[in-house]
Amino acid sequence: MKLNLYVLTPKRIIWDCEVKEIILSTNSGQIGVLPNHAPINTAVDMGPLRIRLLNDQWLTAVLWSGFARIVNNEIIILGNDAELGSDIDPEEAQQALEIAEANLSKAEGTKELVEAKLALRRARIRVEAVNWIPPSN
């Protein structure tokens, strides 16, 4: 059996194809979705989206929050923004992480601290996405 996966943002369609499985970051943790999954509507948290293609190859995307609906082997993810893992430059992601860590240590005041923590979280997620090693089949 297959799942129809659609990942949409206000700017573009990120994904539109059949897949075997996904692992999705939600506000209550990561969930795995296989064919015939129970219907669910859930908030999507900032984090990785793991996609297992029909040929068993795994791909990674990064979702920057949104909403997901899973019903009748169809997954529709409406994201505020998203990036494909293949579009993320590993060196640039690592550099952004180092800058975010430095900015957090220099942050003063509540607003700066919140912004620095958010930037650090985003940078960590991007680094995690490009460094992820898929499970062996």
UniProtKB/Swiss-Prot annotation:
Arranged from A to Z, the UniProt key words for this protein are: ATP synthesis, CF(1), Chloroplast, Hydrogen ion transport, Ion transport, Membrane, Plastid, Thylakoid, Transport
Just give the chief location class: plastid
Gene Ontology terms: biological process: proton motive force-driven ATP synthesis
Q: Name one Pfam family in it.
A: ATP-synt_DE_N
Could you name the Gene Ontology cellular component terms for this entry?
Answer: chloroplast thylakoid membrane; proton-transporting ATP synthase complex
The membrane topology of this protein is: Peripheral membrane protein
Q: State whether keyword 4Fe-4S applies.
A: no
Molecular function as annotated in GO: ATP binding; proton-transporting ATP synthase activity, rotational mechanism
The compartments listed are: Plastid, Chloroplast thylakoid membrane
Task: Tell me yes or no: is DNA-binding among this UniProt entry's keywords.
Answer: no
Q: Of which family is this protein a member?
A: Belongs to the ATPase epsilon chain family.
Q: Which NCBIfam families match?
A: ATP_synt_epsi
Quaternary organization: F-type ATPases have 2 components, CF(1) - the catalytic core - and CF(0) - the membrane proton channel. CF(1) has five subunits: alpha(3), beta(3), gamma(1), delta(1), epsilon(1). CF(0) has three main subunits: a, b and c.
Task performed by this protein: Produces ATP from ADP in the presence of a proton gradient across the membrane.
Kindly give the HAMAP family that the UniProt entry links to this protein.
Answer: ATP_synth_epsil_bac (MF_00530)
Q: What is this protein's record name?
A: ATP synthase epsilon chain, chloroplastic
Q: Which organism is it from?
A: Sorghum bicolor
The beginning of the lineage is: Eukaryota, Viridiplantae, Streptophyta, Embryophyta, Tracheophyta
